[in-house]
Amino acid sequence: MQLTRLSFQAFCIVVGLGIGVLGCTPSSNKTANADSTQSSPAITTAQDDSAPRGDVPYVPTPPEVVSEMLNIAKVNKNDMLYDLGSGDGRIVIEAARRYGMRGVGVDINPELVKEATDNARKAGVSDRASFVEQDLFKTDLSKATVVTLYLLPEVNMRLRPKLFRELKPGTRIVSHAFDMGDWKPERVVEVDGRTIYYWVVPKEIPTSLKN
């Protein structure tokens, strides 16, 4: 069952008080663990899916959603993917494994960065998939041709000016679950009840979107 944005935010406050971190998991541990068991054997998932990650908790994206996110962006071997909030690395690893493209995963949690790096090695894509421990708001995105996100609505909105400022026109952005306010997506796709939003950075940023 999907939560409304308001109820999801309220739920975050309650859980945040209990575990002492900002943000929350929008699903139970049972659901998160179920998602994890569907992932590629080359990818392991931390036992605690609610491990703190700065502004956003870690909740793994299901494999079928990962696949469609890459499909909707029409990625190819010449692309450079940046996954912001990369968790166990599954999006970057799948992109490298399936399409032969390069990718960088950014996460503030050092344990998840280590796990993702180990997963890339196990999958045999360490030469194309790398992971860095960093605040995503401090990450240089200028080399990206594709950016993937699974954050929160308010984080997407805080990130939007940075995307406009640093990404080249034509760069594709794909977000699992959350939009970017009044920036209308070019496509919206549903996969097993989960929503994927897709944008392309325009040559001219409308004045109404710059703030």
Question: What residues fall within each predicted segment?
Answer:
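S-adenosyl-L-methionine
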Residues: 110-143
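C-terminal substrate-binding/active-site "lid" region of AdoMet-derived donor-dependent transferases
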Residues: 154-211
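Conserved SAM-binding motif I beta-strand of class I
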Residues: 102-107
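Conserved class I S-adenosyl-L-methionine
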Residues: 78-87
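Bacterial N-terminal signal peptides that target proteins for export
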Residues: 2-12
